[in-house]
Amino acid sequence: MQVNFDETCDSVIRMNANEQTRSANGIGNGNGESIPGIPDDLRCKRSDGKQWRCTAMSMADKTVCEKHYIQAKKRAANSAFRANQKKAKRRSSLGETDTYSEGKMDDFELPVTSIDHYNNGLASASKSNGRLEKRHNKSLMRYSPETPMMRSFSPRVAVDLNDDLGRDVVMFEEGYRSYRTPPSVAVMDPTRNRSHQSTSPMEYSAASTDVSAESLGEICHQCQRKDRERIISCLKCNQRAFCHNCLSARYSEISLEEVEKVCPACRGLCDCKSCLRSDNTIKVRIREIPVLDKLQYLYRLLSAVLPVIKQIHLEQCMEVELEKRLREVEIDLVRARLKADEQMCCNVCRIPVVDYYRHCPNCSYDLCLRCCQDLREESSVTISGTNQNVQDRKGAPKLKLNFSYKFPEWEANGDGSIPCPPKEYGGCGSHSLNLARIFKMNWVAKLVKNAEEIVSGCKLSDLLNPDMCDSRFCKFAEREESGDNYVYSPSLETIKTDGVAKFEQQWAEGRLVTVKMVLDDSSCSRWDPETIWRDIDELSDEKLREHDPFLKAINCLDGLEVDVRLGEFTRAYKDGKNQETGLPLLWKLKDWPSPSASEEFIFYQRPEFIRSFPFLEYIHPRLGLLNVAAKLPHYSLQNDSGPKIYVSCGTYQEISAGDSLTGIHYNMRDMVYLLVHTSEETTFERVRKTKPVPEEPDQKMSENESLLSPEQKLRDGELHDLSLGEASMEKNEPELALTVNPENLTENGDNMESSCTSSCAGGAQWDVFRRQDVPKLSGYLQRTFQKPDNIQTDFVSRPLYEGLFLNEHHKRQLRDEFGVEPWTFEQHRGEAIFIPAGCPFQITNLQSNIQVALDFLCPESVGESARLAEEIRCLPNDHEAKLQILEIGKISLYAASSAIKEVQKLVLDPKFGAELGFEDSNLTKAVSHNLDEATKRPQQNSCT
């Protein structure tokens, strides 16, 4: 049983009422003393293990009385504080488990977790990278990526879980306790109950070990001092208090009377470290979004994920119908018993299973539904009475695995059942695989039904097409007869007035967006490699600290991996020259900082950094209302999901052997890259002197030439100059610079904001391709970088996933022969680049720079992400793209569940009725009617 916060509060309230009633009637005092007449099964089970046992009545739904329950929680909190006091700064998981959406912990959507996970006495907390050691069930194939797990449980306090009291305490904490926030920085949500917060095991004052000191109004929330003369407590949250000195110095515009009603923290104005690390400001900002806007966000999200969950439901229905026909009886599908940090993958394609799958009870071989469909098609098996083509998307060719090549002896049975593969293929050869499931039987069907009811009852107005002559749009391409040469490029200040409407419209059409002046020069100065290393080093264990450590780096001149000292790399980052040869040292750090260290550094040392990002509704990893990927519960494994820091050396001087570059990336996630630091602190004129790029014959590469990465080609001297040179600049007129028509500038004289040029030197050059150009681009790469015929692969190979790089000759050839031209522009310090999912891009580092990247998933990108998931499924199993695949099916299910409950909460809540009715009465009426219909209508079986 998992007890959540609300149920616990209700139990405490009921218990207090019962205790008062018993005291009034003379039954007992509730303090563990004599209470005669209580049945043994209702008594508190607290004892000394010998003779004594507490005689008080146990709490409702608990095995102990209120006194011993609170004592146990305080003991666990103090134990957790002592155990983690020295290591709190090293926790890589920051933030709170609670999000704005309360729909992420459905009782019917949780995976089945066996209590055997805890029944070994003490919860084993292995200190491998600060993560709880995963125990794998041999009967299930688990997904074990090479990258560190980003979502996982933190090590728990050692509690004897065979004891009823210990089990109650641990399961109580599992229901609400943060898995990301270290004890030293956690701040509870102000909307939570005060009595519950006062004994929270995750909250304590920095000035005292008393976890409830601040909630009692003894300590100033801002300065953490309790020796102030006047401290004003907040009546809204009953938790925080501010001293008069801090209020007059930081919040002088708020009167003391207003502070007493609503404190700065509840207003989202507090800038202390605790509030920044707990995203309190962002929570308040999201909470204050108008209800109608929230509903529109949720409808957009539901409309985007509905096709995906309907596809999942249709595939499940087909398999259920087949299973009923094979068994000729009503079926009750076996549900897999997965632990919270486990993931089941298909034995063939290695893709995580969403819900239904086929399982061998003898050898535990697992097969996803898509592989079942591919095997039946390869075996030419026709299943009568079912819709076999539900997986086909209109207008898109179906991608499937080549089973006949990889498993020539494995075929589907004539009745449509799937036999277990022979032993040489990893199976046991049994006659049939049984249908099994992970979630509850009707969960997906209910989601589809409710989502359709809501979406069909609402219609959002179409966005107006923006004026491309607006000064906020910059010309990044010279395509003929094309309306998307201009890119939306506002400044951060402009976004505050424009809102997200224009961004939404651009994103829906798959166009990139750039945002200028996200960070100022003073903020960027704190992002140099030495400062990053110093801050990360402060979070590491003293025993593991190293003054000048070795780092892994890629030498862009030859593509080889080298070990360099931090000091040596820092010198190369600043001046970039080899003192012996005089050539630039073009190094890119590899996996430094690590994903976990990057997340820890950004959320702990730079808590204000995320808050400075634009479009937080889209990109925030936990609180973004429009970030579909943020709807996953915290216990789900999702790889490669944290912020990443990329440190590279670059130079404006062109090198004949190569350049500092990043090959073509083709992501199923939306990405944002923020250039936080460059080695050039002064403005200078860009001069790049290069030899003319020699003309290359227009012909295919030799059939014996393999598909090499740019680094490998550099090693063999096969790749020509990879950056813009004088010859190419003269030929490609006009230059693709950031320019706008002066006539379109705003009349207020704000030319600095509206101009697309920048006085500082560009740190990186970007080439971003449109989604509609992907087929032509893929064809060109397949023709130019062709694999030899003697190399065969088990699955489909896509050149866009191979990290190739297009130099100026390739881009010119691509434009002349295929009519494909990317958006080409320079990124300046403090500028953010938003790349939609499915838009290939490549980067050339024009000088040493540091990029911070965040991934997210907008509703407008869900369809493209689902399409790319099908492509990635057909890649070889050891391909990097497959190891980092986004579980778009599972994400869509959880997002739909979360959105449905949020809509119900907003629409049916009486306090929002007036606001919704005043804004749009028809919208409110339609949604309420559809929700009532969905609630009253009896839920049918998922596939009948």
UniProtKB/Swiss-Prot annotation:
Skewed-composition ranges (Basic and acidic residues): 685-703
Subcellular location: Nucleus
Post-translational modification: Self-ubiquitinates.
Family assignment from sequence similarity: Belongs to the JARID1 histone demethylase family.
Ranges spanned by the short sequence motif Nuclear localization signal 2, renumbered to the chain: 323-330
Assembly description: Homodimer. Interacts with RDR2. Binds to CMT3. Associates with the E2 ubiquitin-conjugating enzyme UBC10.
Annotated Pfam families: JmjC, WRC, zf-4CXXC_R1
Gene Ontology CC: Ino80 complex; nucleus; Set1C/COMPASS complex
Protein name: E3 ubiquitin-protein ligase JMJ24
Free-text note regarding domains: The RING-type domain is necessary for E3 ubiquitin ligase activity.
Positions contributing to Zn(2+) 1 binding: 220, 223, 243, 246
Domain JmjC: 621-873
Region described as Disordered: 20-40, 77-103, 685-715
PHD-type Zn finger ranges: 217-269
Annotated motif Nuclear localization signal 1, positions: 73-80
Domain WRC: 38-83
Residues at which Zn(2+) 2 binds: 234, 237, 263, 266
Keywords (A to Z) from UniProt: Metal-binding, Nucleus, Transcription, Transcription regulation, Transferase, Ubl conjugation, Ubl conjugation pathway, Zinc, Zinc-finger
Extra remark: Misses iron Fe(2+)-binding sites required for demethylase activity.
